[in-house]
Each structure stands twice: as structure tokens, then as C-alpha cells.
Design a protein with these regions (language model features):
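Long, positively charged amphipathic alpha-helical accessory segments at protein N-termini or as interdomain linkers
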Residues: 9-38, 50, 57-163
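Structural motif
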Residues: 46-47
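A glycine-rich, hydrophobic loop/mini-helix early in the fold
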Residues: 1-11
Length: 163
């Protein structure tokens, strides 16, 4: 599974518009890799089967988006650990992988290159090969101070004295 995290300036756009831009870029990346992908609402599909799911929201003027692209996986293991959906109004989608659709799993490098090539122009941004040391340090501080705390992850009130 290739995970994608995007943080971008909102620029006045609504969430559905931003999600559609991201889904379209991911679908183009998947087509670069050799599969006939289509951007759907909050997903990318191939022949009606979901290969990528997206979710996101705004934090003030900033879009925070996450996506998971199924490159290759052990479907039997996935089926064994997931709880089946029993809601007839919202049946679980059929899923597929890039390996199944193009005959082999593309390398991580190929997937990242395709995603970067399609996402960068949409967001008018460069996509570096790695985070700068100061970005890594900031991410580690934020993880330790807030995002990685159990209370944040579990949606519980912060401990006394923690903001």
C-alpha cells in the first residue's frame, strides 16, 4: 500500500473540489503506471473496483488529505482481519491492486514518481525526494507534543497542563 499525505493551502476552494483535484491526479498517475483508472468521489477505480481511497478535511485555510493506493497485498489476509460491512445501503466496495491490473506490482520508486509527476502541477509545488532536516525535526516535535499522543489519537481530553 502506498500512502499519500498532502497538506496544501485551501485557496478558497470547497472540500469536494479539492478532493476531486486530488482523485483526478491520482487517477492520472495510475494510468501512467498502465491501468485504466477513473477518478470517482473520494476514490480511484479501475473497471469499477477501488484501487485508492481518499479522505480529508480542512484545518482553517489548510487542506489535509490522505490517500491509500493498493499496489499489492495479500487479499486473503486482508479479508481475514477486516470486519465485513453488514449495511445493505452501503455495501463494501470491490477492491483491486495495481499488481492485479497491470500484471506486476510497480516499484515504490515508480509509484512515487508517477504520483509526484501528476500531483505537483495541480498544487503548483515541487515534490522533493526527501524531507529537509528542519522539516523532519518539526514533524518529530509535533508528533511527540500533539499528534502522536494517545489522547489525540483516541479523541480524549488532553491531560492536565497539556495544550
Amino acid at each position: 500500500v502506498q500512502a499519500l499525505d498532502l497538506v496544501a493551502w485551501r485557496g478558497g476552494a470547497a472540500l469536494p473540489e479539492m478532493m476531486a483535484l486530488a482523485a483526478a491526479a491520482i487517477a492520472r498517475a495510475v494510468r501512467r503506471l498502465g491501468a485504466a483508472a477513473v477518478a470517482d468521489e473520494n476514490a480511484v477505480t479501475i473497471a469499477g473496483r477501488k484501487v485508492c481511497g481518499l479522505s480529508g478535511g480542512f484545518s482553517g485555510p489548510v487542506l489535509c488529505l490522505q490517500a491509500s493506493l493498493l499496489v499489492d497485498l495479500d487479499e486473503a489476509l486482508m479479508a481475514a482481519v477486516l470486519v465485513p460491512r453488514r449495511d445493505a445501503h452501503f455495501p463494501a466496495p470491490e477492491v483491486t491492486t495495481l499488481r492485479r491490473e497491470i500484471g506486476e506490482a510497480p516499484t515504490d520508486t515508480a509509484v512515487v514518481a508517477a504520483l509526484a509527476a501528476e500531483m505537483a502541477p495541480v498544487w503548483a509545488a515541487s515534490v522533493p525526494d526527501a524531507m529537509r532536516p528542519e522539516e523532519t525535526a518539526l514533524a518529530e516535535r509535533l508528533l511527540a507534543a500533539e499528534f502522536g499522543r494517545d489522547d489525540v489519537v483516541l479523541g480524549q481530553p488532553a491531560p492536565a497542563g497539556v495544550h
